Amino acid sequence: MSVVFVAASKLPTPFGEFTMHGFLDEESGKEHVALSMGDIADGAPVLGRLHSECLTGDALFSLRCDCGFQLEGALAAIAEEGRGVLLYLRQEGRGIGLLNKIRAYELQDGGADTVEANLQLGFGADQRDYAMCQPMLAHLGVSSLRLMTNNPRKVKALESYAITVAERVPLQRGLNKHNRRYLATKAGKLGHMLGSLHQGEAETT
């Protein structure tokens, strides 16, 4: 994978000022971003998150998922600590793209769960790839993370690229009546660690 650094700038946010680092995957043409705060290249484990793009949750305030809540929670946690990094990865809809995500939502409106909808469209349950994280983190001087995630697949992916996950930090935000079924599916079918509220819970309509 050929991921190259392009530019960096300051990014003031309601949580504090971050540095925004832009990267280009020359093979896919996708543009990824890292937001950093503080000295993250000192060798100590860094509070961090891998956040896949979710236009509906991150920008359009959708309650169908917990993505926007997790994004805000991660940035707030980094700002509170004064040190950390968030990789914003252009992998909309667990890797199937925005329009296919809307198609999947249409199937979910008809009764399918989030995994069934992907499979009915001919996709895997989760098509995301985290290979781009290794060169992005290497550029930033980060080799060890305290990873904010509920997804064990992210932990395994980073470790496969020789990035140490010193700690998994749970990030549970935004449960509501619109996403309860979705989160139950992530726990029951995708193995997400969401606590007793969802773990092993079967979906009900």
Curated annotation (Swiss-Prot):
Enzyme class, first EC level, given as a word: hydrolase
Q: How is the cofactor bound?
A: Binds 1 zinc ion per subunit.
What GO biological process terms does the UniProt entry carry, in alphabetical order? Answer: riboflavin biosynthetic process
Enzyme Commission number: 3.5.4.25
Q: Write out the residues that bind Zn(2+).
A: C54, C65, C67
Q: Which cofactor does it need?
A: Zn(2+)
What metabolic or biological pathway is this protein involved in?
Cofactor biosynthesis; riboflavin biosynthesis; 5-amino-6-(D-ribitylamino)uracil from GTP: step 1/4
Q: Provide this UniProt record's keywords sorted from A to Z.
A: GTP-binding, Hydrolase, Metal-binding, Nucleotide-binding, Riboflavin biosynthesis, Zinc
Q: Which reaction does it catalyse?
A: GTP + 4 H2O = 2,5-diamino-6-hydroxy-4-(5-phosphoribosylamino)-pyrimidine + formate + 2 phosphate + 3 H(+)
**Active site residues of this protein:** D126 (proton acceptor), R128 (nucleophile)
Q: Name one Pfam family in it.
A: GTP_cyclohydro2
Q: Name one GO cellular component term.
A: cytosol
Q: Which residues bind GTP?
A: R49, L50, H51, S52, E53, Q70, E92, G93, R94, T114, T149, K154
One MF term in the entry's GO annotations? zinc ion binding
Family, per entry: Belongs to the GTP cyclohydrolase II family.
Q: What does this protein do?
A: Catalyzes the conversion of GTP to 2,5-diamino-6-ribosylamino-4(3H)-pyrimidinone 5'-phosphate (DARP), formate and pyrophosphate.
Q: What is this protein called?
A: GTP cyclohydrolase-2
Q: Which organism is it from?
A: Pseudomonas aeruginosa (strain UCBPP-PA14)
